[in-house]
């Protein structure tokens, strides 16, 4: 049981880039296809009034960088500090905006990340 808990902690601690690399590795090596969020919701089977209420009360948010404003270097530095990415990866993420900076975070954490990026000069949207 401790091994499973350690694995869960490692998975939760992955950066976006590391999670993407893991998904690619699982797909290439083991032919495991990542499920989209829509499929997971559909597989849940809900569909009644309860399902509608859950959709209205969003608990997980994606922090999406939509623009870099006037201070690209500061935005790249902030993205690096948030994601743990290297310089090249963070620069690519910023240059190719809109891109998610963090996914599936709480409202409070999403607001904090949004404020950090906006303070650096970036434009952010919560989804």
Curated annotation (Swiss-Prot):
Task: Tell me one GO molecular function of this protein.
Answer: mRNA binding
InterPro entries xrefs: Ribosomal_bL12, Ribosomal_bL12_C, Ribosomal_bL12_C/ClpS-like, Ribosomal_bL12_oligo, Ribosomal_bL12_oligo_N_sf
Q: Which Pfam families match?
A: Ribosomal_L12, Ribosomal_L12_N
Keywords carried by this UniProt record? Ribonucleoprotein, Ribosomal protein
- Tagged with keyword Ribonucleoprotein: yes
Please tell me one Gene Ontology term that the record gives under cellular component. cytosolic large ribosomal subunit
Region span, Disordered:
93-127
Mark out the compositionally biased spans (Basic and acidic residues). 105-117
Q: In Gene Ontology terms, what is a biological process of this protein?
A: translation
Q: Which family does it belong to?
A: Belongs to the bacterial ribosomal protein bL12 family.
NCBIfam families hit by this protein: L12 (TIGR00855)
Quaternary context: Homodimer. Part of the ribosomal stalk of the 50S ribosomal subunit. Forms a multimeric L10(L12)X complex, where L10 forms an elongated spine to which 2 to 4 L12 dimers bind in a sequential fashion. Binds GTP-bound translation factors.
State its role.
Forms part of the ribosomal stalk which helps the ribosome interact with GTP-bound translation factors. Is thus essential for accurate translation.
Name of this protein: Large ribosomal subunit protein bL12
Provide the taxonomic classification: Bacteria, Pseudomonadati, Rhodothermota, Rhodothermia, Rhodothermales
């Amino acid at each position: 049981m401790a091994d499973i808990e350690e694995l869960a902690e490692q998975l939760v601690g992955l950066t976006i880039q590391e999670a993407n690399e893991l998904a690619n590795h699982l797909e290439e090596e083991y032919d495991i296809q990542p499920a989209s969020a829509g499929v997971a919701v559909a597989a849940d089977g809900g569909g009644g009034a309860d399902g509608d209420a859950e959709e209205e009360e969003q608990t997980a948010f994606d922090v999406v960088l939509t623009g870099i404003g006037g201070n690209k270097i500061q935005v790249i530095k902030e993205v690096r500090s948030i994601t743990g990415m290297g310089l090249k990866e963070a620069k690519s993420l910023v240059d190719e905006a809109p891109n998610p900076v963090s996914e599936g975070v709480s409202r409070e954490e999403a607001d904090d990340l949004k404020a950090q990026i906006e303070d650096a000069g970036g434009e952010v949207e919560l989804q």
